[in-house]
Amino acid sequence: MTIEELKSAISFGNSDLNIFTISENVVSFVSSSHKRKGVRGSCLYKARPAVSAARLRRLRSPCGILSSVSQTILSV
């Protein structure tokens, strides 16, 4: 799975998140939902090629959507 495919899957599964950066191992996002408006966060992950875009779309958590999350940092 390429970085662009991962970014597309995250955006599709999490319509209230605005992905603003994505690199080889970090995704940064900001929430626009009413409950978490303005919450910023980032996920460190290790990509596993076996994880399909369809499976990623079924997951809702911005970090859970990543194939293997090692750390999550949220701040308001």
UniProtKB/Swiss-Prot annotation:
- List the gene name: stbC
The protein's name in its UniProt record: Putative protein StbC
For this UniProt record, the keywords arranged alphabetically read as follows: Plasmid
